[in-house]
Amino acid sequence: MSKEEFMKIQTCVLKVNIHCDGCKQKVKKILQKIEGVFTTKIDAELGKVTVSGNVDPSVLIKKLLKSGKHAEIWGAPKGGSNNNQNQPNLANQFKAMQIDHGGKGGGGGGGGPANNNKGQKIGGGGGGGGGGGGGGGGGPPKMVIPQLTPQQMQQLNPQQLQQLQQLQQMKGFQDLKLPPQLKGGPGPGPGSVPMNKNPQMPNNPNQKAVKFNVPDDDDEEDFSDEFDDEFDEDDDEFDDDLEDDEFDDHPPPPNKMKPMMGGGNMIMPNNMMPNMMMPNAQQMLNAHKNGGGPGPAGGKIEGKGMPFPVQMGGGGGGPGGKKGGPGGGGGNMGNQNQGGGGKNGGKGGGGHPLDGKMGGGGGGPNGNKGGGGVQMNGGPNGGKKGGGGGGGGGGGPMSGGLPPGFRPMGGGGGGGGGPQSMSMPMGGAMGGPMGSLPQMGGGPGPMSNNMQAVQGLPAMGPGGGGGGGPSAEAPPGYFQGQVSGNGGGGQDSMPGNPYLQQQQQQQQQQYLAAVMNQQRSMGNERFQPMMYARPPPAVNYMPPQPQPHQQHPYPYPYPYPPQYPPHNGDQYSDYFNDENTSSCNIM
């Protein structure tokens, strides 16, 4: 017998039905006829037949069945020199592996401290940190695998070794307690950990879990300062264009295109008069310094996370504006927190984006304690310090240090803060619980309106001080519109007012010039009213109003019916010409 044949010898134990000696002889005879069987040993009482040889047990069973003897394997095959006795045990151990999914994660940690804003110098504080997220779900599945002894490891055939090594490399199995010969050390080979190429990082056996060595973030302050300084000068010119664009919230687009003629609510977008309204940025910043609340010189948000500062009209943060913690104070617009604690801006929160984005320091539900800026929705506490005449609360950007010839345009909502008075940057505070937009003629709702006094024209008196009565004193002798304490019709409802007509013409001319001329300054350069200046072309596509020929005041606030001018019906020949060809027929 060659060595190879000897190595292949297997011992197989079969259970065969043996009733008598005759059966025993018959079985022995059948088995010995089979090729590859060397010895047979039969225990008749137990029906146990032990066969050794180089033969497959299934062949033995087949031959016995053919002879009418039912046979089955007694236990698992026991190897001679192969030592396979432990295989069933090992299979059971693999079955016993439990896959344990991680338990539920713990609850999230509380929010961070209210004020992390290192780089914040002037503006209201940022909102408090949000609450921590809920704890993550349990970790990756853990496998509990029975401990294998080194003897058992040696008995594993290569396929099983490979399976174990694959298990070890799977995510979540790094903590398997395996003997060192299966846990690959550094170096090549299956299951080994790749060599560490970065000497600073410790060798990480968990190749899928990444740990970042990030240096402490000490330069956050420098970051915000660096950007703030870099963009400071740009802010001054952007302030005019961007800050008050249609009062910061996004109203219906048509308002930018033409003024509403009905009800006397003439909306003049603030960005249409940049250089006249904002003569220079320093005065604008000075105006901001009057903002209510502790913010030293509010209006500029310099929060840590902002790549560039946004200058707001709102005064400094109200209470909590300095600390930032209880809620983002200041004009909380670019601050992404948009008003400290959710919709109700807590102590200092500027509330929702629509509720006082530019308000100085918030306060009360959705309100702005400083009443500064253009808050669209001053809550119960709105305008505590009132925007009255540029005093008290932050007033608009124009509430302090105006050039000579301009009158301060404060809010008309009363010094003590009438019903939620709000200072518009255009002057004319918007009172009332929630008017639609800061509007400039007395119109729906208790609106107090101070139109800007244009050089060379009389100033308009207040048109119904919203709760605070008339808040800007027109100089004596000036025609004052119907002053009503609760927002009656403003001057626009009195068409016989010559000053009003002249001023409306001026406004329309300036508005049109702004539309055509975009952002160029127009205070002293264009469209000064001349003695016989014809009415400016209406912006809503109606022909001009021939006021001098009207004997009686037109009783309705909307435009006159179309009456074409006498010069050949061509109203476009001198559309932008100051010379009025239709006023005098004798040339």
UniProtKB/Swiss-Prot annotation:
Lipidation (S-farnesyl cysteine): 584
Modified residues (Cysteine methyl ester): 584
Pro residues bias spans: 534-547, 554-565
Biased composition (Acidic residues): 215-248
Prosegment location in residue numbers: 585-587
Listed Low complexity bias regions: 194-208, 471-483
InterPro entries: HMA_dom, HMA_dom_sf
Record-linked PROSITE patterns: HMA_2
Alphabetized GO MF terms: metal ion binding
CDD domains: HMA (cd00371)
Ranges where the record places region Disordered: 98-146, 176-261, 287-449, 462-504, 532-587
Protein name: Heavy metal-associated isoprenylated plant protein 33
Organism field: Arabidopsis thaliana (Mouse-ear cress)
